Amino acid sequence: MLKNFTRQLFAQLGRHLPRRLVQRDPLPDARNLASAPIPDSLGKQCLNVAAMDENEIWRAFSSHPEGLNEGEVAQKIAQYGENQIPAQKPSPWWVHLWSCYRNPFNLLLTVLGIVSYSTEDLFAAAVIALMVGISTLLNFIQEARSTKAADALKAMVSNTATVLRVVNEQGESRWCELPIDQLVPGDIVKLSAGDMIPADLRIIQARDLFVAQASLTGESLPVEKVTRTRDPLQTNPLECDTLCFMGTNVVSGSAQAIVFATGGGTWFGQLAGRVSEQESEPNAFQKGISRVSMLLIRFMLVMTPIVLLINGYTKGDWWEAALFALSVAVGLTPEMLPMIVTSTLARGAVKLSKQKVIVKHLDAIQNFGAMDILCTDKTGTLTQDKIVLENHTDVSGKVSERVLHTAWLNSHYQTGLKNLLDTAVLEGVELEPARGLAERWQKVDEIPFDFERRRMSVVVQEQDNVHQLICKGALQEILNVSTQVRYNGDIVPLDDTMLRRIRRVTDTLNRQGLRVVAVATKYLPAREGDYQRADESDLILEGYIAFLDPPKETTAPALKALNASGITVKILTGDSELVAAKVCHEVGLDAGDVVIGSQVEALNDDELAELAKRTTLFARLAPLHKERIVTLLKREGHVVGFMGDGINDAPALRAADIGISVDGAVDIAREAADIILLEKSLMVLEEGVIEGRRTFANMLKYIKMTASSNFGNVFSVLVASAFLPFLPMLPLHLLIQNLLYDVSQVAIPFDNVDDEQIRKPQRWNPADLGRFMVFFGPISSIFDILTFCLMWWVFHANTPEHQTLFQSGWFVVGLLSQTLIVHMIRTRRIPFIQSRAAWPLIVMTLLVMVVGIALPFSPLAGYLQLQALPLSYFPWLIAILAGYMTLTQMVKGFYSRRYGWQ
């Protein structure tokens, strides 16, 4: 029966420990985004809608060109609901406070406190209550400061949309500005530059419409949207050129579109809609500290009954033995672990906040230090998410100012909405040359862009009798209307040989990840009247302008620093492999063999896990491909970070041990992340890694000290209990000693850390902790036994009448040795000489040691059942402590050479 009870107790503790020790639930957190794949039915629906003609669209969504009337809207709202994404509600403060309290250590101490109170040991009960209260309140305060309850999904889209509705019984239609939650399937929406897409839409009218959907697909350049699909065989809904998806935005142009999905039925809604349905799994930090904590709790649960049995049997007073065993249990419980962990992590968060980094989840600090693989999106994360003019060359690939200035005139004089490429061209010419071009050349006319021609032209003049037509557009479309080429300053025919040369140059640019636009000209006699499309013929190909989304300035040094810190960087992007490989080259990463999304789809988990370990660049990935790769790398035993800024990154951010987002990220990505970088510099990543390793090292100091001290103390108690006719220390003494020791450890979060402890990723290792206990615990027991001998034979405290002297002597030795151990095992070096603790820790340990020595001489000595120690005791005390420190240093040297030092 006892065996079953113990098994059930361990099961309960193990079930609750991973999340409740450091991470509170259920605070509002987009990390709970469901990882379930997008349903096939939704993908098929999108593809069907994309292929429909206009009449089929009206029938499918029970709509009509005049818009919906009030009755139809009410019916559809009843059928489909409001256009809202489900969001998780923040928990009230008292639920958060309760979750801060209910970790296994606090629950265990509460039970011990109740037992102490029921036995009228009020002091012990008060001390335990103080420990539990401090730990709980500190956790609550620190996490309340660190966690911001934000409704990311509601902030994801714009507040209103322009909708065509029937406004009266006569059937009169009017464009209305309505809140987006009132949109229903079948509504007709007007789009213009700058608008966020308020629902999933099918385009029915479009003029020069470009939509930025990098947040969904990772593609850095805006994509064209048209009324009739150019690719009827398209199988990826996100690449359908007749569909727009919620959460993306219009870059340029205008359109009318019909709503075909709203709220949780949208593509974005499927990614985000299961926020409250699934609980995120414990990350590496939670799993590690769970295993370590269970080791310490098991040790306490095993040793306490042994102490009870030995004392009860040898002393014959089972009640006194029970009280003593209870005090031992309190002493063996690492009650300060939650507070030390939280305060250490919180200090790291405060230090990072000075670097303009928001730490939303405290355990992310340690995961930063443990991370050995960083997977990162490309667009907007490593890159500037801004199109710049990278090259301007003639047809042979040589840099050409003529081509640049010609392209500038085209972009400058067009009257349509300028897209990102035009903006990049205009910014590519300095102010003075641009002013000179504008003064020399006057606009005559233009031929606007359309998607059939995929080019646009302006006509300018420098002399009264000559006009120049400048045409800019997609390479193939320009070649279709060109007959000549400007080559080495001469005008030559565009023959097959020249065409092969052109292809070689442009293919090279494409392989470099550049988007190539061709520029051509034509000289015409001056004339009156408008120019037409037919004038775009017999053009002279001048050269090319090529564009790129460049890396941030800090990307290359940041990735180099991460690599030097033992972290492997992998790129996971939805963009093309050519563009991604170019960025990898720019930032100093060897892309190697690129793996694309279709390959990921074809592999099973074992094959993909093996491939993921040796692959640096993954391209053309869907959101769930990224999540799958991150999950499989975690399965292989890695601590994985993911850095991204788009909707398509949210599942991977949630799946990673540490999610990192950057400035300018969409709200859903910021909410899914644990860490948010508020500045463009990525160098703070290195600082975060170092801070994570520093906090881990300081947490490990407390755990090592607690584990080794507890092991040694229990061994000493067992030896003393077996041979002494009285208790080696009263329960009250154990509680006071434990309280003073805990006070000395409050300064651990402020301690220094040796350089070698932050060079490589640091992880929890329960096996190493167990070995550490066995090596260092008995050292203190050796000197405890020497103290027993000293008090018994030298000071003759060997009868029950003299037990107070015996207990006072061991109280001082035990407290001082336990307090000094922090300086011995906080470093593998020689303490105080090669490595010195931070001043707060030195001051706290000195203070506790002074208090411990003074208590037997203080007015409280009688109440505490201590007595003044003879002066001859103190030389022995110094010798014992010196011997203890010397032997510990010797064992430490052997241990670090044999097993290493965390």
Could you tell me what each predicted segment is?
Residues 1-184, 189-197, 202-210, 214-221, ...:
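Non-lumenal N-terminal regulatory segments of integral membrane proteins
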Residues 82-114, 147, 234-243, 274-302, ...:
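Soluble-to-membrane junctions at the N-terminal ends of transmembrane alpha-helices
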Residues 99-118, 132, 136, 158-159, ...:
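Alpha-helical transmembrane segments of multi-pass membrane proteins
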Residues 107-127, 167-170, 295-333, 346-356, ...:
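Helix-interface capping motifs at the ends of transmembrane segments in multi-pass membrane proteins
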Residues 119, 127-158, 165, 281-376, ...:
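Hydrophobic alpha-helical transmembrane segments
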Residues 210, 217, 227-231, 384-404, ...:
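Basic, amphipathic juxtamembrane/active-site segments
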Residues 243-251, 367-541, 547, 560-561, ...:
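Cytosolic catalytic regions of ATP/NTP-dependent phosphoryl-transfer enzymes
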Residues 307, 338, 345-347, 591-642, ...:
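Membrane-embedded transport module
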